[in-house]
Each structure stands twice: as structure tokens, then as C-alpha cells.
């Protein structure tokens, strides 16, 4: 199966500006292609993984990704369907841009190029912008773009209205100076992709470039992919732990699992089909979900963080915390109830840990042998908690029975 058909199999193709040219470039040549990221936040989210995995997949087949970080366009803001974006300061835009570049460098290694459009957009004066670029865009053409249409009633500023011109300048710049032949983006970027192709044609009188969009990833129930109850799922482990990421994908529905395996992993087609077949035989074992969760966490955070996520998952499932690594204990701090030890008595600590509702109840639990710390059953209510055995001189698990526990941090 050729590369373009592989992209179609994976659900990575929605709109293509020139189908035959796209097939020729991807199947018969080794080309440069680009994907752009505006630094609207300090981290990318799991929603960005679709484009990242596609870059990795094309790189694997000999093409060169060019990652454009929008330090310039981030100052303007891509029009949203609902309301105007808050403007970033130059300092914040460039700071976010550097963080996102570093994040992507951790994901895409080897033959890859990075550019920041602030380098060229910041050098264009207003007169040059209007004469050299603005003259190639008719207002009626711009008004017909979906993102603009959806904002006409509620209002759109000239700042955001001009965003497509800036992104088109990016496309022209990369086509002229880096021989970039394809721009990839989500289907919500289709208007910007085609505007860039039109600018190349008008300025250079030719156009052998291609725009290619992918469907926006929605879950089977129609909700947006990449959101949890606590909000966005970030690729920065300080914002979303590898354990949380693992749990998100482990809990994927059976109806979502096939598209997630195709869009968010580099697992090849034959193996994906085998995984799905095994899963269909015994869906209650959640085989496909486990493969997916492992693949995504390892891709984003590496093997070591995956092992930590697996350790914590197993500990919480089994109720056994022996042998955890320091990293696993650190993860537990954000997952289960945590109590900071400040010299409390055992009775006070049991109440503080929410394992008892009162001192009297705590005393009963202790005398009945229901309380243990770090696996040691405690029956003496006068026990000195400070002398307990600690993992890494910092952590201990206090528990009542098998399923009620908390993490003590000394």
C-alpha cells in the first residue's frame, strides 16, 4: 500500500487541494512539508498529537517535517468560532513559542527543521504588508472563509480578520526559501491553507504546492477529544502527569479505540488489525485500550515515565504499594489523598487522612487492627508515627482495610 493510501487508512486525510499532485509528492518524491503551531499556551495538548503523529509517520517514510512556531501569528490570534482571543504580549508569545519548540523537539528527532515566523513577519512594515500582500486578497474572498463567516454576526476585529494573510505569507516564505511542498493542518485550518496556495500562485505565477487537511478528532459521542473532567490534557508532564494521560486512553470507549490507534500511534496497519481482532474476541479485557495507552504515553514521555504510570496503575488496582519507585510515589501525590505529617499523633493522623470521622472511631479502628502504615499493622494508639518506616525517607501509605488509604508525606 502506498503512503497516501496509508494516510487515508489512518483517517489523516479530509480535504486535498490537488489529489494527483499530493499522491505524486508523497508516493514518488522525498519532500519537505510543514505544520504550524501558534503559541497560545505554554504547552501543546493531546489534541495536537494528530499532527505530531502524522509528522512522525511521514518522517519515517523519508519526508522532512518543517515545524513552524507562530511567534508572530501568535501575537494576532487565529479567529475562533465564538469570540475574540486575548492578545498575548510579545514577551509571552516568544516565551510560549520557545517552550512549544522544546516540547516538539522532545517528540520529533532526527531529520526535522524548526522555524519561527516572528523572524520574517516582524520585519514587514505596514506599507509593504498592504502593497506586497494585501493587494492579492479580495475582501469578498476573505469573507467567504468559514472561520470569518461564523464570526460576522458576533463581530471580528480587523486584527483577526487579517490572520489568514499572515499565515499565507508563512506558506509563501517556506515555499520560496525552504522548498516546502505541502502544508498539513486540521480541517478548521482549510481556509488558511487554501489562502496560502492562492498567494503563492498570485506572487510567483505558479503553484506546485499542496494543502492537505485532516478531520478534527471527535469522540464517538460527539464531544471534543482531549478534554477530561479537570480540563485540557497537556503534553507537559508538569501540567498533566503521564499517569493521567495513561488513564485517559485506558478508559477510551470501544467505539473510539480504532480511530485512536490509527491517528495517535505509529503502529502499522497489520498490527492494528490484529490488536482490534484480539480486542473484539474479549472486549472486557480492554486489550486495545492497554496497547493504545502504553503507545501514547511512551511516545510522549518515554519508557521510564510509562513504567511509572504502569506501576501506579497496578498499585491502585491491587492495593499493594510495595516496591514503588520514587517517581511513582511522586505521581501518587496528585492521585490519592495526601496528608503532610506535622507531628500529629496516630489518632490525629487517622482522622486527618479521612480514614476515620472522629478520634473515638480512629481509636476503635486502631485497637481492632484495621490501621496499617507502610504495610505494618498498628494496634497501639500511642504509636510514634515519626518513627515509622518511610520510602525514600519521605513517603508512607496509611490505610484502613484494603481499599481506603492515603499518602503520608514527611
Swiss-Prot record:
Location(s), subcellular: Cytoplasm
Cellular component, GO, one term: cytosol
Motif ('HIGH' region): 39-48
Entry keyword Aminoacyl-tRNA synthetase: yes
GO biological process, one term: tyrosyl-tRNA aminoacylation
Domain named S4 RNA-binding: residues: 344-410
Residues that coordinate or bind ATP: 227
Annotated catalysed reactions: tRNA(Tyr) + L-tyrosine + ATP = L-tyrosyl-tRNA(Tyr) + AMP + diphosphate + H(+)
GO MF term list: ATP binding; RNA binding; tyrosine-tRNA ligase activity
Catalytic activity, EC: 6.1.1.1
Biological role: Catalyzes the attachment of tyrosine to tRNA(Tyr) in a two-step reaction: tyrosine is first activated by ATP to form Tyr-AMP and then transferred to the acceptor end of tRNA(Tyr).
NCBIfam families the UniProt entry points to: tyrS
Assembly with partners or alone: Homodimer.
HAMAP family hit by this protein: Tyr_tRNA_synth_type1 (MF_02006)
Similarity field: Belongs to the class-I aminoacyl-tRNA synthetase family. TyrS type 1 subfamily.
Protein name listed in UniProt: Tyrosine--tRNA ligase
Organism: Acholeplasma laidlawii (strain PG-8A)
Amino acid at each position: 500500500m502506498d503512503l497516501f493510501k496509508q494516510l487515508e487508512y489512518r483517517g489523516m486525510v479530509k480535504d486535498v487541494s490537488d489529489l494527483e499532485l499530493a499522491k505524486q509528492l508523497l508516493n514518488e518524491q522525498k519532500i519537505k512539508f510543514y505544520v504550524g503551531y501558534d503559541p497560545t499556551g505554554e504547552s501543546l495538548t493531546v489534541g495536537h498529537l494528530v499532527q505530531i503523529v502524522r509528522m512522525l509517520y511521514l518522517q519515517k517514510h523519508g519526508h522532512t517535517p518543517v515545524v513552524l512556531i507562530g511567534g508572530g501569528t501568535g501575537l494576532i490570534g487565529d479567529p475562533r468560532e465564538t469570540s475574540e482571543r486575548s492578545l498575548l504580549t510579545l514577551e509571552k508569545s516568544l516565551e510560549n513559542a520557545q517552550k512549544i519548540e522544546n516540547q516538539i523537539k522532545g517528540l520529533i528527532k532526527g531529520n526535522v527543521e524548526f522555524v519561527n515566523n516572528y523572524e520574517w513577519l516582524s520585519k514587514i512594515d505596514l506599507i509593504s504588508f498592504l502593497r506586497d500582500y494585501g493587494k492579492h486578497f479580495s475582501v469578498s474572498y476573505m469573507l467567504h472563509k468559514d472561520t470569518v463567516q461564523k464570526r460576522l454576526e458576533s463581530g471580528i476585529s480587523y486584527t483577526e480578520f487579517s490572520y489568514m494573510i499572515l499565515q499565507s505569507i508563512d506558506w509563501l516564505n517556506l515555499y520560496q526559501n525552504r522548498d516546502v511542498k505541502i502544508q498539513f493542518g486540521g480541517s478548521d485550518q482549510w481556509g488558511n491553507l487554501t489562502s496560502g496556495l492562492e498567494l503563492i500562485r498570485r506572487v510567483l505565477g505558479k503553484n506546485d504546492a499542496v494543502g492537505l487537511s485532516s478531520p478534527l478528532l471527535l469522540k464517538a459521542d460527539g464531544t471534543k477529544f482531549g478534554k477530561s473532567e479537570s480540563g485540557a490534557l497537556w503534553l507537559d508532564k508538569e501540567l498533566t502527569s503521564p499517569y493521567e494521560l495513561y488513564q485517559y486512553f485506558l478508559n477510551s470507549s470501544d467505539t473510539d479505540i480504532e480511530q485512536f490507534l490509527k491517528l495517535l500511534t505509529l503502529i502499522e496497519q497489520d498490527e492494528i488489525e490484529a490488536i482490534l481482532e484480539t480486542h473484539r474476541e474479549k472486549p472486557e479485557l480492554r486489550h486495545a485500550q492497554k496497547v493504545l495507552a502504553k503507545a501514547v504515553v511512551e511516545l510522549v514521555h518515554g519508557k521510564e515515565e510509562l513504567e511509572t504510570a504502569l506501576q501506579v496503575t497496578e498499585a491502585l488496582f491491587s492495593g499493594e504499594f510495595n516496591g514503588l519507585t520514587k517517581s511513582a510515589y511522586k505521581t501518587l501525590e496528585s492521585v490519592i489523598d495526601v496528608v503532610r505529617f506535622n507531628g500529629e499523633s496516630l489518632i490525629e493522623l487517622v482522622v486527618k487522612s479521612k480514614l476515620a470521622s472522629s478520634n473515638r472511631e480512629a481509636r476503635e479502628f486502631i485497637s481492632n487492627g484495621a490501621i496499617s502504615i507502610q504495610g505494618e499493622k498498628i494496634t497501639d494508639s500511642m504509636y510514634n508515627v515519626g518513627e515509622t518506616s518511610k520510602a525514600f525517607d519521605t513517603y508512607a501509605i496509611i490505610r484502613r482495610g484494603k481499599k481506603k488509604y492515603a499518602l503520608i508525606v514527611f
